[in-house]
Amino acid sequence: LEHLDPFRIPAFEQVLFAHAAPGTVILTTPNREYNVKYPALKTGALRHGDHRFEWTRQEFADWAAHVCRSYGYQVVCSGIGEEDPQVGAPTQMGVFTKCV
């Protein structure tokens, strides 16, 4: 997701969830909250030059809930990597399952 310009996300949603409409979709994206754990990363900077944005856990969960409401999916969000009690895991994942 983070490699897309934010204005392209609605089109991405349409293509993936409405037109292709696979039974299962697995998406991962950085957890912006975790960036404080990278001492060399300046405040507000993105982890990679090709990232267009990075979402907090709440922002990702809100977007995932929107996708589910709009396209008939259920989602389970979780972290990937060692989880910090305050900022969560470095990467977040959503496993979307098409409702039947």
PLM region descriptions:
Residues 4-100:
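S-adenosyl-L-methionine-dependent methyltransferase catalytic module, highlighting the catalytic core
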Residues 1:
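Conserved P-loop NTPase "ATPase switch" module shared by AAA+ and STAND
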